[in-house]
Design a protein with these regions (language model features):
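SH3-family beta-barrel domains
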Residues: 19-37, 45-51, 58-99, 106-116, ...
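Extracytoplasmic Gram-positive cell-surface binding/anchoring modules and repeats
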Residues: 41
Length: 148
């Protein structure tokens, strides 16, 4: 194999392998949606979930998406029930949302576990910028939320 061809093949393989491990988060778009144990309406219904719940997309088929939730549970959901809009789920019992990405910054609001907040961006220093459904924005530590 010619060196340029081998290099091109190597770069293609490395790029493809990297994309396999990239996390792809989606959220529930409908007011509620059903999680199933298989990609079929005839499958066992596992759970009903609410709008904005973040889910990690594991596999996508034509009409179904295999997803993982914050507890690590795997299930299937109809693709039309999902949105690409990003949300995070609060996983700590009580979380202070700060005005700036600093622990000593003023707190703009507090929120509880299992609340969904719109994801705006993640910083390199471990903070996530979020928006509450009421429109208030602030920063939380990345370790206190899931789905970022």
């Amino acid at each position: 194999m010619e060196p340029p061809v081998a290099l091109a093949l190597f770069i293609t393989l490395i790029t493809a392998a990297g994309s396999v491990y990239a996390l792809d988060y989606v959220s529930v778009a409908d007011s509620s949606a059903i999680l199933y144990d298989a990609p079929s309406l005839k499958a066992k219904k596992i759970f009903v979930v609410n709008r904005y719940l973040p889910l990690e997309q594991v596999v996508s088929l034509d009409d179904w998406v295999k997803v993982r939730d914050s507890s690590g549970s795997i299930s299937w959901i109809e693709k039309h029930a999902l949105s690409s809009k990003r949300f995070v789920e609060v996983i700590s019992p009580l979380v202070a949302v700060h005005e700036e990405a600093e622990a000593d910054a003023p707190v703009v609001f507090n929120t509880r576990q299992q609340v969904a907040l719109e994801w705006l961006e993640t910083s390199d220093d471990g903070w996530v910028k979020v928006r509450h459904p009421d429109g208030i924005t602030g920063y939380v530590k990345a370790k206190e939320v899931w789905g970022e």
